[in-house]
Each structure stands twice: as structure tokens, then as C-alpha cells.
UniProtKB/Swiss-Prot annotation:
Taxonomic placement: Bacteria, Bacillati, Cyanobacteriota, Cyanophyceae, Nostocales
Native organism: Nostoc punctiforme (strain ATCC 29133 / PCC 73102)
A GO molecular-function descriptor: quinone binding
Protein name (record): NAD(P)H-quinone oxidoreductase subunit L
Protein family: Belongs to the complex I NdhL subunit family.
Main location: membrane
Summary of subunit composition and partner proteins: NDH-1 can be composed of about 15 different subunits; different subcomplexes with different compositions have been identified which probably have different functions.
GO cellular component assignments: plasma membrane-derived thylakoid membrane
EC number: 7.1.1.-
Cited function: NDH-1 shuttles electrons from an unknown electron donor, via FMN and iron-sulfur (Fe-S) centers, to quinones in the respiratory and/or the photosynthetic chain. The immediate electron acceptor for the enzyme in this species is believed to be plastoquinone. Couples the redox reaction to proton translocation, and thus conserves the redox energy in a proton gradient. Cyanobacterial NDH-1 also plays a role in inorganic carbon-concentration.
Enzyme class, UniProt record, top EC level: translocase
This protein's encoding gene: ndhL
Membrane-topology descriptor: Multi-pass membrane protein
Length: 70
């Protein structure tokens, strides 16, 4: 029973908790990241890809519309 609970906690962290943190990190740092930090971002997306796929229908992090001054 303990092992099943441990697997459930690890699966929840891998598929939900950490990918949510990765999405917010990418949203905050995407346009200002250095090259090493961008490499870390690519690794995180590669490593947590299944969780990001699970969350992708619900996440909407498109850039905000620009305000054009006339």
C-alpha cells in the first residue's frame, strides 16, 4: 500500500505539479533568458513533455496583444 501511494505521488508530481511550475517558469523567463538558461528550458520541456501534453489543453500562455500607439 505504501509503495502504491509513493508511485501515485511521484506520478502526480511528474505529470501535474512540476510541469505547472515549468510552464510558469517559461512564461516568466522566455524573452529574457540567456543561452545557458534557454538550454535548461529546452531540457525541462524535453524531460517533462508528457506532463506538458496533459496540461496543454488547459494552459493558455499566449503573448498579450500589443498596444499600438498612433
Amino acid at each position: 500500500m505504501i509503495v502504491a501511494l509513493l508511485y501515485l505521488i511521484l506520478a502526480g508530481a511528474y505529470l501535474l505539479v512540476i510541469p505547472i511550475a515549468v510552464l510558469f517558469y517559461l512564461k516568466q523567463r522566455w524573452y529574457v533568458a540567456s543561452s545557458i538558461e534557454r538550454l535548461l528550458m529546452y531540457f525541462l520541456v524535453f524531460f517533462f513533455f508528457p506532463g506538458l501534453l496533459v496540461l496543454s489543453p488547459f494552459a493558455n500562455f499566449r503573448p498579450q496583444r500589443r498596444q499600438v500607439q498612433v
